[in-house]
Amino acid sequence: MAAGMGSRYGGMKQIDPVGPCGQVIVDYSLYDARRAGFETVIFVIKHEIEEAFKAAIGDRVSKVMDVKYAFQQLDELPEGYTIPEGRVKPWGTCHAVLAAKPCIHGPFAVINADDYYGPEAFKVIYDYLSTHTDGESTTTVW
């Protein structure tokens, strides 16, 4: 999940370079995920950062993975739920997965774009998902 502005960080840490050649943290995860066998990535972002995110990450990633976008919007809630007065932030991980639901067509994994997991984590989850399915492709949601 790639969301948007980090309130404590003071910017969009998901697209700020950290590597020696300008890599962002999610570049390392995407590399590991692709090597493990994941072919599709769904970025869950806010509409406000769409252009900047695509320019910094999405356009480049689309050369090696199938890239889809889902947009987490505060007012898109399951029936019976309402937004509390004064709430301005998205709802978190479950809400992000709900926003990505139309793009998910099989087993999937969820990670945060600003965390590093390492290659073994992707291998383990891909191996599990690909052996416990009906042959559907696996997807990673960021």
Locate the predicted segments by residue.
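Short amphipathic helix/loop within the catalytic HATPase_c
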Residues: 61
